Structures are given as C-alpha cells and as structure tokens.
Amino acid sequence: MERRKHNTQDYKILALDVATHCGWALDKTIYGVWNLTPKRDESAGMRLIRFRSKLKEVITSEHINLVVFERPGGRHVGAVIVQSELQGQVKVICEDLNIPYRGYSSQEIKKFATGKGNVGKPAMIAAAKQKLNYTGDNDNEADAIWLLELAKSEYK
C-alpha cells in the first residue's frame, strides 16, 4: 500500500496481531482475542476458516476500510508459518473487498510503544497500561492496541 498521510477520521481501522490467539483492536477500549485453536478432531485448516469468518464479520459489521497487522517474524518456525497463513488470509479478504492493508514489523510496533524495538511481552503490556489506560493482561490485545495507535499516527 502506498504510504501517504491521511486523516484517520477517513478510516475505520482494524488492527490484528495475527496468531492462533489473534489479538484485535478497533479502539483503545474495543479489543479482544480470537482463539483460533483447532479442536482435537479438526484439521489445522479450521484455524483459517475460523479466522476468515471472524475477519469478514468484523470488516462488514464495523465498516472497516483499513486493516493493519503485525508481519510474521520470530524464531519459532511453526508460529511463523501460522502467522504467514493468517496474513495471507488478511490480504486475500482485503483484496476481495477492495480494502487497503498494511503490515508492520514487531520491531516497529515495539519501538513505537516503548522507544525500544526489542522489548518483551511484559514491557508492551506495561506500556499499554501506563500510556493507553489498558486494563487487561493479554499481550495479544496489547500488541493489537499498539498496532492500532501506530496506524493512527501514520495515517493522520
């Protein structure tokens, strides 16, 4: 997506921390986690089906017109594969619906939130509590909220 400055009032943004426990945020106070874990007798593809369903539901019901997500990364190959599959779903759905999307690296999000690009999950949660009045304890939610704030700062 072309990087341009926009007024965030033009956008209804959905931020996604794509993973099996997928953090999402629409606002500093409207956020959550989708548990996409396949059940015992299901194939791994059910994670993608659940994700597609939830993503389409939120995009249509909330009139989303910009989706931002954390790009896959890390040392755990299995997690990177899952993140890549989910990111692919985001891109396909957004392309189908003609909705712009943007990926951010973990380091970009962490640096925006804390000033350092290599902090751990507890530091991201603590920064969200201190700076954004976040009341939860879930790193997936905190990451999604920070991602939303980063996108808002870029698209003002």
Residue spans of the language-model regions?
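Phosphate- and other anionic-substrate recognition elements at nucleic-acid/protein interfaces
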Residues: M1-K156
